[in-house]
Amino acid sequence: MRALFPGRFQPFHLGHLQVVKWLLDRYEELIIMIGSGQESHSPYNPFTAGERLVMVKESLAETGIDLRKVVIFPVMESFTSKNWIRIVEMYSPHFDVIISGNPLVYTVAKEAGYMVERVPMFNRDIYNATRIRKLIMENDLKWMECVPKSVSQFIRDIKGDERIRDVTKNDYTED
C-alpha cells in the first residue's frame, strides 16, 4: 500500500522524521506532499516549496531512508474542502490512504471517500514547527536540537534563520 503524508513542513523537524519512519514501517511506499507550495517569506510559511523539498530529501538521506520508497513533491493549493482533495488527486501519484494529524485534512479526505489514518504525534510539545519558528525568531539556538542536522545546516546556509527574524519584524520594530 502507498500512503500520502501531506504537510507544510515549515520547517521539517525531528517529529516529522519520526512519522516518516513510522509510516515506512507500515506502508510499502510513502508520498510526502509539501503543501502550500505557493506560500513563502511570511512568519507562518517562511520557506519556499523548493527549500522545504530539499530539507525533506536531505533529512531522509541523512537518516539512511531508502529514497526509492519515497516520492516527495510540492503542490500549490486552495484550501477549500472540495478543491483541496481534487488538487491533491491531480498532482499526486496514486495513494491508498491519507495520513494526517490535521483534523481538517482528516475530515476532508474521509468525506471524499479516502481511507484515512491519524498520524501519531512524537513529542509534539518539543517537535512543533510553530515552536521552532518562534525559537529561531528569538535567536534561541535550541531550535537546532529540534531538526535534523541537515535541516539546521541548510537553514543557516540559505540564511533562513535571518529571514524568519526579518519577516516577523513589524513596523514598530527597530532595525
From Swiss-Prot:
Reactions that this protein is recorded to catalyse: beta-nicotinamide D-ribonucleotide + ATP + H(+) = diphosphate + NAD(+)
Query: Which cysteine pairs make disulfide bonds?
Result: none
Where in or outside the cell is it found?
Answer: Cytoplasm
Task: Report the protein name in the record.
Answer: Nicotinamide-nucleotide adenylyltransferase 1
Q: Which GO terms describe its molecular function?
A: ATP binding; nicotinamide-nucleotide adenylyltransferase activity
What EC class does the entry list? transferase
Gene3D superfamilies linked:
HUPs
Report whether Magnesium shows up as a keyword of the record.
no
The protein's annotated pathway: Cofactor biosynthesis; NAD(+) biosynthesis; NAD(+) from nicotinamide D-ribonucleotide: step 1/1
Which UniProt keywords are present, listed alphabetically?
Answer: ATP-binding, Cytoplasm, NAD, Nucleotide-binding, Nucleotidyltransferase, Pyridine nucleotide biosynthesis, Transferase
Single GO biological process annotation from the record: NAD biosynthetic process
Family designation:
Belongs to the archaeal NMN adenylyltransferase family.
HAMAP family with a match to the protein in the record:
NMN_adenylyltr
Q: List the NCBIfam families hit by this protein, alphabetically.
A: arch_NMN_Atrans, cyt_tran_rel, PRK01153.1
* Broad class of the protein's primary localization: cytoplasm
Recorded superkingdom: Archaea
Species assigned in the record: Sulfolobus acidocaldarius (strain ATCC 33909 / DSM 639 / JCM 8929 / NBRC 15157 / NCIMB 11770)
* Organism lineage: Archaea, Thermoproteota, Thermoprotei, Sulfolobales, Sulfolobaceae
Q: Which GO terms describe its cellular component?
A: cytoplasm
Q: Which InterPro entries match?
A: Cyt_trans-like, NMN_Atrans_arc, Rossmann-like_a/b/a_fold
The EC code for this enzyme is 2.7.7.1
